[in-house]
Design a protein with these regions (language model features):
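Short, well-ordered alpha-helical segments enriched in acidic and aromatic residues
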Residues: 64-76, 183-186
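Flexible, glycine-rich surface segments
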Residues: 172-283
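Short beta-strand edge/turn micro-motifs at domain boundaries
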Residues: 113-156, 160-163, 294-298
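Bacterial N-terminal signal peptides
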Residues: 17-32
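C-terminal soluble interaction/assembly domains
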Residues: 268-322, 335-336
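N-terminal secretory signal peptides that target proteins for export/translocation
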Residues: 1-16
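Surface-exposed, charged secondary-structure patches
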Residues: 76-124, 232, 236-239, 249-251, ...
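Short, low-complexity N-terminal intrinsically disordered segments enriched in polar/charged residues
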Residues: 37-58, 142-167, 171
């Protein structure tokens, strides 16, 4: 459904932390007065705000997206379908949990009712509005704010994940793997079964974690499973973004154009790209980084997914902007 996260940057070392709180339909920013919107044709109406909220919570609990669309109207489709099924399910579950924990209503000066949920009194971005004797969710009123918050939280998360991947590649390079004494970077995320030719491999009890072990464990705890990044050669989304390793760099990169792989081993460096599953829905900016740790970002436009998925080299020219606080990232800054 919808999501928000309470996030912040900690001072000292540039470490990025995310206090993830996935709550469906919850955002702030309702103090402004956007234009008035009409009820959508065919949208369900209710006898009271409580009846409307109860119906939405019941539909979310059953993950009944058709019923949720009937309640929110067709303009709510982008809010319900983010492109990340795991995140959508988690958001539904958290909304239901917070709704049943506590909920109340408060009137606004614009004639709408705001639903607050959970002990934290989170305001739901989509207000309720009265039409005649009936109430309905005024989805268009709060839709843009919901998308802004979803995109913002996803983009902060992708920076953290990129830093973890940089840290993981450095950790991989520092050790030998599969009896090969040559120091090299991993060419893929998930290792071949029984090998350590990727950044993640399964370990037995008591064995050290693989470089991406903690990140994969975090993804698994959120419902993404061990295939959070790639499986069978197919990319999978993680918090609305897809990640891909790049094996060469272009002329705009420091050191000029070159292949990272020499004689089958990636010794010359590494790079990665992270791009949104759905442009202006799960994210806007596309991100790249290499072994130096500096992350760059660029808005590739509506074709971002296609453009980024076809990229084969790291080549941040002057149209790419550095992400503040990620320059010269140290492993200690990321791992803590």
């Amino acid at each position: 459904m919808l999501q928000t996260k309470d996030y912040k940057r900690e001072s000292g070392g540039g470490r990025l932390t995310l206090k993830v709180l996935l709550i469906g339909l919850v955002v702030g920013g309702l103090g402004t007065s956007p234009p008035t919107f009409a009820q959508e044709s065919g949208q369900k109406t209710f006898s009271s705000p409580t009846a409307a909220a109860d119906a939405l919570a019941a539909a979310a609990q059953k993950h009944d997206k058709q019923e949720m669309l009937a309640i929110l109207g067709h303009s709510g489709e982008e809010l319900i379908y983010s492109g990340d099924r795991v995140a959508d399910k988690a958001n539904n579950d958290h909304f239901v949990e917070k709704y049943h924990q506590m909920h109340r209503f408060a009137a606004t000066g614009s004639g709408r009712m705001i639903l607050y949920i959970g002990a934290e009194n989170w305001p739901v971005a989509i207000p309720l509005k009265k039409s005649g004797a009936k109430w309905y969710f005024d989805t268009s009123y709060g839709k843009q704010e919901v998308l802004y918050r979803r995109i913002g939280s996803n983009e902060l998360n992708v920076i953290k994940v990129c830093q973890e991947i940089v840290s993981g590649e450095r950790e991989y390079y520092a050790a030998s793997h599969d009896g090969d004494s040559v120091h090299q970077y991993a060419q893929k995320f998930r290792s071949t079964p029984g090998k350590q030719d990727g950044l993640y491999w399964e370990v037995k009890s008591g064995e050290p974690e693989s470089p991406l072990g903690p990140l994969v464990a975090e993804a698994a705890s959120e419902g993404y499973g061990h295939h959070a990044h790639h499986a069978a050669g197919k990319p999978h989304s993680f918090h609305g973004y897809i990640y891909k390793l790049l094996h060469r760099q272009g002329a705009a990169a420091h050191g000029g154009a070159q292949d990272y792989i020499v004689d089958g081993k990636m010794t010359g460096g590494f790079a990665l790209i992270a791009y949104p599953v759905r442009y202006r829905d799960s994210g806007v900016m596309t991100f790249v980084a290499n072994q130096d740790g500096q992350i760059y970002q660029k808005d590739l436009g509506p074709r971002a997914n296609q453009i980024a998925s076809e990229m084969t080299e790291y080549n941040p020219d002057d149209t790419w902007q550095p992400v503040d606080g990620t320059e010269n990232t140290k492993v200690s800054d990321i791992r803590g």
